[in-house]
């Protein structure tokens, strides 16, 4: 089947925001207006088209990234609706990796919120052009100008309105387009019924001023516009649109639009902005990959180049089995074709190719550069793997995912559950790179680890619903880490004589802190003092010892180990001896390099009425929290603080009690930090390890 939409007429976009800003409702309305669905569902009623998992419909939140495709102004728009809850940021991250542009939805009353900052950071990391949609303009307390100020203040970005709302809160009735200087008025909630009206007289001067501010903001991106404006000539609609688009594509300018998705006001204007300003696959830089020899290779959005795609999501579908979502960067591929998983060096077969609409699907014969689709039949492919033409060895940059910060033990209720649980956990871990499972060697318990309590709740619930596994779950535990804080040289010898051939391994290793860079091993052996064949054993010995910890059994992270000297024995030296010597060196570093325990620190935001600020701050301080800021949020105060995760269990109940249920809070993992000495001693004592 030939390509239906040219690359120029294709948009791959994500919709992202803080929880409850209205992402899923916005996507629903987009699908409604583009004719993809004929009846809209409401998230809070559990009827949303995009929230298709049972847990999503019950909880009224989006957990996985549902993908769908629609058409607007003869353009094909592939949309991914992403979760706003902090426990599911991995879904946002892997979606942004394969998108060309995004719509960031913010609440007109709240402005930029903590999760907005998180997803914005992720989008910036992947250099994704964005437009900003200020939603809920009909909400009590809605303030369009203040919402834009929060973009400047909290994100530090260049953002200007390209629209001006007519009215606010219950009086929100229309929009002035600052690019074309035209106005529309909305009537009725069921459909976006509009009529063109003259710009209201009381807003005319403000609209002219805001258009001039917009022109000044984007003039640097277009020389012709700059000259036209400086010479006092009228800036045409085409010229202004071109300059805005250039700024957006450079990821240096972010146009802001307004509306109320729930009331069907402004959604068509959002779609227009997507077409006018967000990139097609032709507008983004070619994707960079490397061959197995490390040679850089670029792939362009071109059907005639070799097939190259990135798998960005794996999920189990109750009807077709394992589904692998992928983005095609170059070339084309037919269903039934064989491809190479270059990441794993294995051949795979595209059994069927599906175009997804939330959890319904349409089978297609062929996909082309710029397409997002799902494949059935891939056996070994996981998130972040590259798929390419057979005999090609290009590997695209993969994705980095945060380590879990919270864990619980799960115990199957029956022998039958025991047999099924391992298989269920393996499938769930394959779908979600931030979900880890392992067996505690001391207790024999199965441990599951994730990004938060809700994350683990959902996974345990899925285990019950989808895999029919009943399990008891223990209280959540914090996932601590260990590290070294002082550089030190450590010498270790492993010598064993017991008749016949003995064991001999001798190493001298410099250990030093390596903040934020994980484990790094450097080989500086010269003159053959340790034979080359034993050096990998030293590295392996260290890596195995890191997992078991040196203080309290938690994984050791962020250290650099430089092997610089040692010796060997012609007969007794072996791989095992050097592995043991290396692990002895790491254990010895516990005291000499000042080992410490690290704990996850959460970025917490509490929004509370003024009357309870003192109670909230007192409670945060008592939890070892460090206050960062306070700022007004309508009739309330927003308090930001960094608080150890271990102190946040049960916080929701405490906050309800301290504020008579009138405050809300969100938290997300921010960084690891050293545990105070007294608490470190308690943890070590509790773990029964020295």
UniProtKB/Swiss-Prot annotation:
Example GO molecular function = translation elongation factor activity
Q: Where is the signal peptide?
A: none
Keyword GTP-binding assigned to the entry: answer is yes
Query: What InterPro entries does the record point to?
Result: EF-G-like_DII (IPR053905), EFG_II (IPR041095), EFG_III (IPR009022), EFG_III/V (IPR035647), EFG_IV (IPR047872), EFG_V (IPR035649), EFG_V-like (IPR000640), G_TR_CS (IPR031157)
Residue ranges of every copy of the tr-type G domain listed in the record = 8-282
Q: GO annotations under biological process?
A: ribosome disassembly
Which residues does the record give as GTP binding sites?
A: 17-24, 81-85, 135-138
**Which SUPFAM superfamilies does its entry note?**
EF-G C-terminal domain-like, P-loop containing nucleoside triphosphate hydrolases, Ribosomal protein S5 domain 2-like, Translation proteins
Per UniProt, which keywords does this protein have? Cytoplasm, Elongation factor, GTP-binding, Nucleotide-binding, Protein biosynthesis
One cellular component term (GO) for this entry is: cytoplasm
Pfam families named among the record's database cross-references? EF-G_D2 (PF22042), EFG_C (PF00679), EFG_III (PF14492), EFG_IV (PF03764), GTP_EFTU (PF00009)
UniProt-annotated location(s): Cytoplasm
NCBIfam families membership: EF-G, PRK12740.1-5, small_GTP
Quote the function comment for this protein: Catalyzes the GTP-dependent ribosomal translocation step during translation elongation. During this step, the ribosome changes from the pre-translocational (PRE) to the post-translocational (POST) state as the newly formed A-site-bound peptidyl-tRNA and P-site-bound deacylated tRNA move to the P and E sites, respectively. Catalyzes the coordinated movement of the two tRNA molecules, the mRNA and conformational changes in the ribosome.
Instruction: Report the sequence similarity comment from the record.
Output: Belongs to the TRAFAC class translation factor GTPase superfamily. Classic translation factor GTPase family. EF-G/EF-2 subfamily.
Q: What is this protein called?
A: Elongation factor G
Q: Which gene encodes it?
A: fusA
């Amino acid at each position: 089947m030939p390509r239906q939409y040219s690359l120029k007429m294709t948009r791959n976009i994500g919709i992202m925001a803080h929880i409850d800003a209205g992402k899923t409702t916005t996507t629903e309305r987009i699908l409604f207006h583009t004719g993809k669905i004929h009846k809209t569902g409401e998230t809070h009623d559990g009827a949303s088209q995009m929230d298709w998992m049972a847990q999503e419909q019950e909880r009224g939140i989006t957990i996985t990234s549902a993908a769908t495709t629609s058409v607007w102004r003869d353009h094909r728009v592939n949309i991914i609706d992403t979760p706003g809850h902090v426990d599911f940021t991995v879904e946002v991250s892997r979606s942004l990796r394969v998108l060309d542009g995004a719509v960031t939805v913010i609440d007109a009353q709240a402005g930029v919120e903590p999760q907005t900052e998180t997803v914005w950071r992720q989008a910036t990391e992947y250099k994704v052009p964005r437009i900003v949609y200020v939603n809920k303009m009909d909400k009590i307390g809605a303030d369009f100008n203040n919402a834009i100020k929060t973009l400047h203040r909290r994100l530090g970005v260049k953002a200007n309105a390209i629209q001006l709302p007519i009215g606010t809160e219950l009086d929100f009735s229309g929009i002035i387009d600052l690019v074309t200087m035209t106005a529309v008025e909305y009537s009725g909630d069921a459909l976006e019924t509009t009529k063109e009206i003259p710009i209201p007289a009381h807003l005319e001067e403000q609209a002219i001023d805001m258009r001039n501010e917009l022109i000044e903001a984007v003039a640097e991106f277009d020389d012709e516009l700059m000259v036209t404006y400086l010479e006092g000539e009228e800036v045409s609609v085409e010229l202004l649109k071109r300059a805005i688009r250039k700024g957006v594509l450079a990821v240096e300018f972010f146009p802001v639009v307004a509306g109320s998705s729930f009331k069907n006001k402004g959604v068509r204007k959002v779609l227009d902005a997507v077409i006018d300003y967000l990139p097609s696959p032709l507008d983004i830089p070619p994707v960079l990959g490397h061959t197995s020899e490390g040679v850089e290779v670029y792939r362009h959005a071109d059907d005639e180049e070799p097939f190259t795609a990135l798998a960005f999501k794996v999920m189990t579908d109750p009807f077709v089995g394992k589904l692998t979502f992928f983005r095609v960067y170059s070339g084309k591929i037919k269903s039934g074709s064989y491809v190479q998983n270059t990441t794993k060096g294995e051949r795979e077969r595209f059994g069927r190719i599906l175009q997804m609409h939330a959890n319904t699907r349409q089978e297609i014969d062929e996909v082309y550069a710029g397409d997002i689709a799902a494949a059935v039949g891939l056996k070994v492919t996981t998130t972040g793997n590259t798929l390419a033409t057979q005999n090609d060895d290009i590997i695209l940059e993969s994705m980095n995912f945060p380590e879990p910060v919270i864990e619980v033990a799960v115990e199957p209720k029956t022998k039958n559950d025991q047999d099924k649980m391992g298989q269920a956990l393996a499938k769930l871990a394959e779908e979600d790179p931030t979900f880890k499972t392992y067996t505690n060697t001391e207790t024999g318990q199965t441990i599951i680890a994730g990004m938060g309590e809700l994350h683990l709740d959902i996974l345990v619930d899925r285990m019950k619903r989808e895999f029919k596994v009943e399990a008891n779950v223990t209280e959540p535990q914090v996932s601590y880490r260990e590290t070294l804080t002082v550089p030190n040289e450590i010498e270790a010898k492993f010598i064993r004589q017991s008749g016949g051939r003995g064991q001999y391994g001798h190493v001298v290793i410099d250990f030093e802190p390596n903040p934020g860079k994980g484990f790094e091993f450097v080989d500086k052996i010269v003159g053959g003092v340790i034979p080359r064949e034993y050096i990998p054993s030293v590295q392996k010995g260290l890596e195995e010892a890191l997992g078991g910890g040196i203080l309290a059994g938690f994984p050791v992270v962020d250290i650099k180990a430089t092997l610089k000297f040692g010796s060997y024995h012609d007969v007794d030296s072996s791989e095992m001896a050097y592995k043991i010597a290396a692990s002895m060196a790491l254990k010895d570093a516990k005291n000499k390099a000042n080992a410490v325990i690290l704990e996850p620190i959460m970025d917490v935001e509490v929004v509370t009425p003024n009357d309870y600020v003192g109670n909230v701050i007192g409670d945060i301080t008592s939890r070892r929290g460090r206050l960062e800021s306070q700022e007004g949020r309508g009739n309330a105060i927003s308090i930001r603080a960094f608080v150890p995760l271990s102190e946040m269990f049960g916080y929701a109940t405490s906050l309800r009690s301290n504020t008579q249920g009138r405050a809300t809070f969100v938290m997300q993992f921010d960084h690891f930090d050293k545990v105070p000495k007294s608490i470190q001693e308690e943890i070590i004592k509790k773990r029964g390890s020295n």
